Amino acid sequence: MQIAVDLITFLNNPRPTMKKLLITLFAGLGISVQAQYWQQSVDYTMDITMNVENHQYDGYQKVQYTNNSPDTLQKAYFHLYFNAFQPESMMDVRSRTIVDPDRRVTDRIYGLGSDEVGFQEIRELTQNGMPLGWEVNGTVLKCTLAEPLLPGESTTFEMRWNAQVPKQIRRSGWNNKEGVEFTMTQWYPKLAEYDEDGWHPDQYVGREFYGVWGTFDVTVHIDKSYVLGGTGYLQNPEDVGFGYGGVKKVRLGRNELRTWHFKADRVHDFAFAADPDYKHVQLQIENGPLVHLLYDPKTANEANWIKI
């Protein structure tokens, strides 16, 4: 504190040459620190087909990853968060053995049946069109790059996988306590963060998430009775209905899936919720954003939602 006081006194002292020198020094220091800062970036393009009967989905994603670090990268890591929701997983064992477990978890993972566990099974992974080998350890996939990723350059991963959505215990899953059929967060193979300390391929045991900020272009094909809300902006309200874009109803074939297309920029994750009982209302705030409300009339206080 005394140093700060002395500095203010010095700057107020009428010695222009020294004052100018000191201000220039601080300005240069700020520019230097800013010039040294870097952050990785990623762009996801996904196409997802949901099976609402068995709570599984087939996924494809193209991931463009830009290396803004000063380092050459020889490998990459992806998080497979759904793998945590299996008996004997690291998260399960931890939740059953620590002194103060999360009351939402305790031994619930251990009791999940084969149709209630979560998993993500990778079927194909390439880098710039070249096949990659990979190994999975719990909730982390590790791959060695076919081509090193140099500083300032970008590379493209393509991945196909099958996943089963777990019965909800924490953030993500099906049939949560509010009765929502699908609550989807951290649900796709997610590229791990790389920063000044290196890669962060942390096993998921129920703590917060650290990942790359980026853009998401996500297409979800799902049973036509389901209403979705997702991160970002819906791109095809005319194909969806349910009040999006003022469109009430869109007729589809008997067994046809409804396609939802969302885009989101500069976000940390893409999440969505889906339920056949959702009611959707959109409200334009004066001089503000367009707000979307989704609720189940059977479980929510609909009168209060209407007042909003």
Residue ranges and their predicted role:
Residues M1-W38:
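Bacterial Sec-dependent N-terminal signal peptides
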Residues V33-D58, E178, T185:
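N-terminal, polar/Ser/Thr-rich
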Residues M46-T49, V63, P131-G133, T144-P148, ...:
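Beta-strand-rich interaction surfaces with strong enrichment in secreted/lumenal proteins
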Residues Q61-V63, N67, L80, E153-K167, ...:
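Short, hydrophobic/aromatic-enriched beta-strand segments in well-ordered soluble domains
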Residues K62-A84, S89, D100-R103:
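Ligand-binding face of N-terminal immunoglobulin V-set domains in extracellular IgSF glycoproteins
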Residues T66, R103-G179:
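A surface-exposed beta-strand-loop module
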Residues M90-D102, A163-F216, V281-E286:
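Glycine/proline-rich low-complexity spacer/linker segments in large multi-domain proteins
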Residues K190-G198, G206-I308:
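Hydrophobic helix-coil surface modules that form long, contiguous segments used
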